[in-house]
């Protein structure tokens, strides 16, 4: 669970038959150095690579942590609008079919596609606007693996947009 105001990720477990939830561990602490977080906003679990991916909203980056031992694996991003630069990223999802990580780069009004192998920049889609395929403060993301779709909450346009997970092209919107 991304615990923004406490600057950490809480790893929880469902215990036993009663469905109780218990704290397993905590990742991160407040700060701007590697393994430190400033308002983590979303997490994605990548079981294929034994890691948890975290969008670090106020540090303008993405951190990768090992699921097994909770060690920091890597950090990418810094504030800006270039290829590996982010501006207050909110959401993150894993596109397993295309071996990509998709980051919701909220204040740059775009989605950033990274390689799930080495976090290299692949491409980005959209920028600010209200037309189909444009965003105004996108905030959340989900992947429909079966239909090869990306579902994005487009906050200030008050809609949800659906894009192709193949190339990020606009498919339809609702809301």
Please identify what each model-predicted range represents:
Residues 1, 10, 51-53, 100-102, ...:
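Conserved beta-propeller blade signature
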Residues 4-5, 14, 57-58, 106-107, ...:
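Short loop/turn segments immediately following the C-termini of beta-strands
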Residues 13-18, 66-70, 115-118, 164-167:
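Short loop/turn segments that connect beta-strands within beta-propeller blades
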Residues 16-41, 72-90, 121-139, 167-175:
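Gly/Pro-rich loop segments of beta-rich domains
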Residues 45-49, 94-98, 143-147:
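Residue-level detector of Asp-centered blade-edge/turn motifs that repeat once per structural unit
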Residues 98, 117-120, 147, 166-169:
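Thr-biased low-complexity repeat/linker tracts and other Thr-enriched repetitive architectures
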């Amino acid at each position: 669970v991304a615990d923004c105001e406490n600057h950490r990720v809480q790893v929880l477990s469902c215990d036993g038959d009663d469905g109780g939830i218990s704290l397993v561990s905590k990742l991160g602490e407040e700060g701007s150095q590697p393994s430190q977080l400033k308002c983590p906003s979303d997490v994605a679990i990548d079981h294929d690579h034994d890691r948890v991916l975290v969008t670090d909203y106020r540090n303008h980056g993405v951190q990768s942590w090992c699921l097994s031992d909770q060690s920091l694996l890597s950090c990418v991003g810094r504030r800006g609008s270039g290829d590996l630069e982010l501006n207050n990223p909110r959401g993150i999802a894993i596109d397993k079919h295309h071996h990509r990580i998709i980051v919701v780069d909220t204040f740059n009004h775009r989605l950033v596609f990274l390689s799930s192998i080495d976090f290299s920049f692949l491409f980005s889609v959209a920028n600010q606007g209200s037309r189909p395929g444009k965003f105004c403060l996108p905030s959340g993301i989900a992947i429909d693996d079966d239909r090869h779709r990306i579902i994005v909450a487009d906050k200030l346009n008050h809609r949800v947009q659906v894009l192709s997970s193949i190339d990020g092209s606009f498919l339809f919107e609702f809301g």
